[in-house]
Amino acid sequence: MAESNSWRSHRESDGNRSIPNGDDARNVRETGVQTDAKVQGQGPRLSKANLFTLLSLWMELFPKREACQQENDAAGVSGLVVVHECRVLGLHCSSAQLHAGQVAVVKHGPRLKSCELYFSRKPCSTCLKMLINAGVSRISYWPGDAELSLLSESLHHGSSSALQEAVLDATAAERLKSNSRPHISVLLQPLDCTVLQFLDETSQNADFLGKIVADNPALDTGDIYRREFWNNSDNFLEKFFISDEERHKYVLNKMGLENFCMEPNFSNLRQHMRNLIRILASVASSVPALLEDYGFFMREPVGMGSPGLPQGVIRHCVIQARLLACRTEDPKVGVGAVIWAEGKQSQCDGTGQLYLVGCGYNAYPVGSQYAEYPQMDHKQEERQNRKYRYILHAEQNALTFRSAEIKAEDNTMMFVTKCPCDECVPLIGCAGIKQIYTTDLDSNKVKHDISYLRFNKLNGVQKFIVSVREK
């Protein structure tokens, strides 16, 4: 695990080196999902490209009730994020029947036109030709192994014919790329030097860990977080990182990424991949997996309403919301929210019957420039110069920019990283949300200009709160 141990002594400045990819990331003026803002002046936050890339990696790990092995080939599971005009239309992963790209075509069809797609693996030629034909504007992918694995030991039974097919498919995919209109590339943007440390700190201080420690003062948040972090780090590096440099160069060459094999591009690429994996490990560690019998359990009697989701799926969705919070425009109180619904019929997606309704994070109104609105909290004595009346909450943005309508017949669920405030509770109740998964650490509290008194009084919505499993 030499690669894993290398972060302990890594220089954060390495993650800031620009990665050549046709666009100079340092000279691109980033347009936020909400606020138009240059990198200068903003607090530490993930870029859109890095956020969507991390979401695609995380979707590859979506828990499945049964093993997902494609029936018709040796393709590995891929995660996919579908984005249109900075709005997330879908979070997908491969199923037993379909690759992630095929899932997108079936689920979105003509709505894929002008969309940006972020894959956790370079898609195969079968998916690429369909997506190009659908008129997508950009296809970005993680620079690890391809969907049809180019690493022989990753293939089932180590079949040489399967490896040969993977090489032929990589050649066909490269030809499709060179002759297509969409921009197909690796899109990893430089990290601000403070992002890694900031996200480590905010993950360690997340409400989910805070709830566990509040109930058990003898526990140490730092110890819990570090144990989870190093476990996640090892697992994610094994999953998403090719530790052997020569084998990594072989894969990059087969995928048409020869420029990345030359120094300093190669070292910069690998350092940036490690940094993003570290962020994913950090965020995932903020929601421990059933630590000390903790999980998301319903307050009401079990007989009321729909049954809750499996704990693994709940945790996965909450971590999606935590990743969204990394893009917040209020880094002091970053909040993320994601809405999923459970349909009645089996779907082609690797998420089973679940489909994305919407997602968001707290941010200022669309189109506003940085510092147009107050940034200060209660420390600003003049109340009219505080941020609270201007910033949109994560729950509000998830409902406003939803990609699907909320259906009365489906079980619609919201996953949010903090207890909903009194401004959001009525919206959640009236929108048709049937279940909410969150923490009640702030419930029944008043914090200066924001209160949390109405959450416990929210009727008609099942509340699944971080708590100890009943014996």
Swiss-Prot record:
Provide the residue positions that the database annotates as binding Zn(2+) 2. 393, 421, 424
Identify a single GO molecular function assigned to this protein.
dCMP deaminase activity
**PROSITE patterns, from UniProt?**
CYT_DCMP_DEAMINASES_1, CYT_DCMP_DEAMINASES_2
List keywords of the entry alphabetically.
Answer: Hydrolase, Metal-binding, Repeat, Zinc
| Keyword Hydrolase in record | yes
Co-factor(s): Zn(2+)
Q: Which gene encodes it?
A: cdadc1
The protein's name in its UniProt record: Cytidine and dCMP deaminase domain-containing protein 1
Which PANTHER family does this one have? DEOXYCYTIDYLATE DEAMINASE (PTHR11086:SF18), DEOXYCYTIDYLATE DEAMINASE-RELATED (PTHR11086)
Reply yes or no: does the keyword Ribonucleoprotein apply. no
Q: Where does Zn(2+) 1 bind?
A: 99, 124, 127
Q: Name one GO biological process term.
A: cytidine deamination
Q: Which domain of life is it from?
A: Eukaryota
Q: What is its EC number?
A: 3.5.4.5
UniProt similarity note:
Belongs to the cytidine and deoxycytidylate deaminase family.
GO CC entries: cytoplasm
Which residues does the annotated region (Disordered) include?
A: 1-27
Q: What class of enzyme is it?
A: hydrolase
Domain CMP/dCMP-type deaminase span(s) in chain numbering: 57-153, 312-460
Active site positions: 395 (proton donor)
What is this enzyme's catalytic activity, as reactions?
A: 2'-deoxycytidine + H2O + H(+) = 2'-deoxyuridine + NH4(+); cytidine + H2O + H(+) = uridine + NH4(+)
Q: What does this protein do?
A: Catalyzes the deamination of cytidine and deoxycytidine into uridine and deoxyuridine, respectively.
